[in-house]
Amino acid sequence: MSFSDDGWGAEAEVKVAEDVPEKNVPPPVEPPRAPQSTAIKTEPERNSDEPSAGFGIDPITTSKTFGSQTTPKTEFGGAPSLSGFGGNAAAAAANKTSFDQQGNGFGGAAKHGFGGVGGAPSSFGANVIPVNKPSLGHKTTGFGGEPKHVSGGAFSSANNFDQQDKGFGGAASSGFGNGSMLTNQKVGLENQTTGVGASEVPTSKPSSFGQQPAVVSGFGGAAKMGFGGSSSSGFGGQKAGATESSGFPTKETSTSQPGFGGDSSTGFGSGLKAGFGGHGAGAAENSGLPTETTGFGGKLPSAGFGASSSNESAFGQQSKGFGGATKNGFGGDSSSSFGSGSKAGFGGTSSSGIGGQKPGATESSGFPTKETSTSGGTFGSGFGGKPTSTGFGAPSTTDSSSGQQTAGFGGASKPGFGGDSSTGFGSGLKAGFGGHRASTAENSGLPTETTGFGGKLPPAGFGASSSNESAFGQQSKGFGGATKNGFGGDSSNSFGKRDSGFGGPQDQGFGDTDAPSKSGLGSFNTGGGAVKSAFGAAGFGSSSNFGNGNTFGEPSDNQRGNWDGGERPRGCHNCGEEGHISKECDKPKVPRFPCRNCEQLGHFASDCDQPRVPRGPCRNCGIEGHFAVDCDQPKVPRGPCRNCGQEGHFAKDCQNERVRMEPTEPCRRCAEEGHWGYECPTRPKDLQGNFLESYDFVFTPDDKMFEDAVNNDDKIDFDQKVVASTGKVEIPDMASFDGFKILPQDLHDNLKRMKMNRPTPIQRASFFPIMHGNDVVACAHTGSGKTLAFLIPFVIKLMEEFEKDRDVTDEKPSPRLLIVAPTRELVNQTFTTARQLTYETGLKCGLAFGGYSRNANVQHLRSFSQLNILVATMGRLQDFVNAGEVSLSKMKYIVLDEADRMVDSNDFGEEVSKIIGSPGERTQQTVLFSASFSEDLQSDDLPKFVKEGYTMLQVDKFGTANEKIDQKILPVPRTEKRDAIYKLLGIDENTVTLLPDAPIEKQKTLIFVNSVKFCDTLAALISSAGVSTISMHSYQNQEQRDRTLDDFRRGKYQCMVASNVCARGLNIAGLDHVVNYDMPDKNGFDEYVNRIGRTGRAGFTGTSTAFVDVENDTDIIPCLVSILNEAKKEVPEWLTEGAGHQEEGGDDWNEQEQEW
């Protein structure tokens, strides 16, 4: 017969004589190995009628306790007749196998190595010394066995892992704990063993875990120093000089040694005091786990586990042990023991024991008890108790064959836990935990007939001795069994067997090599993903466990969410419907949690109508009940001043000189050293469409403010006529600014830096009215110098006041001059001009507009001890005033730039009125400048903002376009505008490429459209033709807009597509061409004038082109005709026809100039 000789796939055949006489066997000569001098003492054969004592049972007698040896029969650790865990080989003839018996049980009498007998150095379960036969008359082969054939080193004889001398407990050739291939058929002590460490007479079947046919020393066999050896340091071993080996804990006779499992004083299973399963010297019997003193299953006076004494508390002993027979042991038969025989034991014989015996029973049998006639009681009266009880473990119906009940947990019939029928724990027929069948009338404790833990007959008990099922350590399929699927068996499913064992070579072992159908870890055909049910088959990485099937990694078909490897479907968290996620859900948002403010369900905290409840103390004063923003206590700084580093005040209140703190860390934007994030030259990533994104405004350094200054004196018409609406207005006729005698030298120097040598007509006309304190309304075409026209006189006034109040410090930002403009770009441009003009004068200029980080904006305004000039948009100004960040109490002068929008009641008029008040109440001087004023504004809105007697100044005519702009009007239907723009710019409409000498290559062009979205689209179309193009609109954040405008001004881009944000006030140097791709609406007269006014500024000439759709732009055509006429431009005939009937009376808004 062949079997696995190394437990890993290789096969070998070893034939052994049927009967081996007891004699010393010389060791083989092994030059590389150092032999040991220790020899094995022989032991007499044990009588098969000797009571059993191991973790296992005896089919003939009935023991009462768990590990007791007071009666011939045994259960869990009983007398040494059956060969269970820690069993004895004495009953081998009747029981065939033990899990720790004298022969080759776990913890047997062998000596050397882990399962070995001899003394070879560093062998794993090996032995090399010739010794006398152990008690069974054969060499040991099991786990801790003695060598049958001494043959070389570990893993060297026939390459077996469990070989004769150094195998993992093996003595011959095969498997995990298998013995050699012997043929002896003796019965009794020399029976073949199959348990873990069991010893039996060899048969045609290979041996089990830790066994060898006809050999004594399995796991803890008969040698000396093995794991459980018999001499000094074995795990449960026998003392030197012992005549018997008894499996796991051994029996001692004379002296003792202190090995691990030795029989001396401190060994694990030692024989005197504290061993695990040790027994006393001179004891008549050795019964596996129970030994003499304090061992696990000890026998004599101390307190061993399952000891048999009557005075101590051994676990399972006679007195108080676990399963003891006297007083209060675990399973004892007296009064309060666990499973005692009287009343309250766990499994006691009276009324309330769990597993108690039926009324009238004469014996107590520990955990599950034996019954005789009838039973009764309820829960608490029989853990495996009486047939009529219904309690925990109680039966419910009577089995006709046994007279017991069937359904109790530990009941007497079939499915009880410990019942003796079919599925009980320790039951007597099939599936008990350690059950056996000695007869159907007797059920004695945990071990029962068949599939019990340590069971004996056909099914699959732990350590059972049958030949056809899967007992743990049995002959058939036990743990270390010899036939089918034992642990270490050599047949079909054993651990380390030839078919599917651990390392088996055939079907499905660990590291299996050929069979493709089963399921070992790393089996032949599928490796870690085999077909069925081991690690790597239906387990890890296969169809039903980890990595597949219905556990970790992928669910099975019948589970919720079988997605066949696809993405797991997930419904909307808001509405529960599939097909979209919650952020795309068009249903109203449903709160899933209580409101964080009022803790009520049904609404969000942002929608809560209850007063806001602070969740902690005030961050300012530390008192509960209010927020820091509502705290009435003075604000307490949490750290040192950021300016001077001193404690006790905020940076905004710091009286020390403003100190620029050098950065101590890299810039947060570019990670470079040497500058703060707000000074970073790089720009953050564009966030298109996020127009609410704020940023830190980057100011132009003082030394670079004048780099873009251009002298345009040769292009400006200084002879333009200025008309005043009031009596006599002195308009000085000066060729240069030197004629302004009151002009301070610092201001004069700054004008030279700005390359302003001569005042423009509007600057000359507005100078003295403003200096005299009059309210002024000035109208001049774009690019005529309006900004300096109001700045120069006001700066002169501010410089005079600053000399008087130089030491005054404002508690909060309080501007003296307030300039309000409609767009951020115009605010920024005006602020830059004001900084240039006040350079080195001591005056401080600030700005405020949306898009600039609010906190940074506030800090910017607070950084001045005096704020002389503030340039702001209406929205941010209103915010700061309402929040108390800015005070207007010291304001003396107000300027409304692009005033036609600022005073229009349909635009900013209402907000401006709230800020500056009515003219009758207002003491401040007010100046309004714009490129156009309609008659309606003059009559209806201007009186609300300026005082009576104001001065109106006009350069040429109100609302006229700059004559230096060449206006072209083209009839283009809406559907043909794209082709028209391509043609106008010099782009081939078929190939979308630039034509030779394309006009766009020579002209800086600004294209206006009405749709914000179409800005980006048209810019992309033009850019695809190879023209450097960029877009600018209100949906961009302010930093994008500033950067775009700056890049276009500097010539980085040749073309820009913009919405109306670029229509007013922007000075774009060198702009050659303005295109109105879309015309303004019917109210867009002023808008058209301002759009085309971006070119032809400061005396330069420019060109404008308008695409007019006759069908859709009919409302603006009359206004357009009038503008062309007044600008002395040719009006196309088709445009005049388009005006049609609207000509008559349609231009009353453009009547002749009034008499002033």
Swiss-Prot record:
Region (Disordered): 1-81, 194-213, 231-423, 436-522, 1135-1156
Domain Helicase ATP-binding positions: 767-951
One CC-aspect GO term: P granule
Entry-linked SMART domains: DEXDc, HELICc, ZnF_C2HC
Compositionally biased tracts (Gly residues): 259-281, 321-332, 342-358, 408-423, 478-489
InterPro entries the UniProt entry points to: DEAD/DEAH_box_helicase_dom (IPR011545), Helicase_ATP-bd (IPR014001), Helicase_C-like (IPR001650), P-loop_NTPase (IPR027417), RNA-helicase_DEAD-box_CS (IPR000629), Znf_CCHC (IPR001878), Znf_CCHC_sf (IPR036875)
Biased composition (Polar residues): 60-73, 194-211, 243-258, 307-319, 362-371, 395-406, 440-451, 464-476
Gene name, Swiss-Prot/TrEMBL: glh-4
Pfam families for this protein: DEAD (PF00270), Helicase_C (PF00271), zf-CCHC (PF00098)
Role noted for this protein: Probable ATP-binding RNA helicase. May act redundantly with the P-granule component glh-1 to regulate the formation of the granular structure of P-granules in embryos. May protect somatic cells from excessive apoptosis during normal development.
Biased composition range(s): Basic and acidic residues: 12-22
Name used for this protein in its record: ATP-dependent RNA helicase glh-4
Any one GO molecular function term: ATP hydrolysis activity
Acidic residues compositional bias, start-end: 1145-1156
Compositional bias per record (Pro residues), positions renumbered to this chain: 24-34
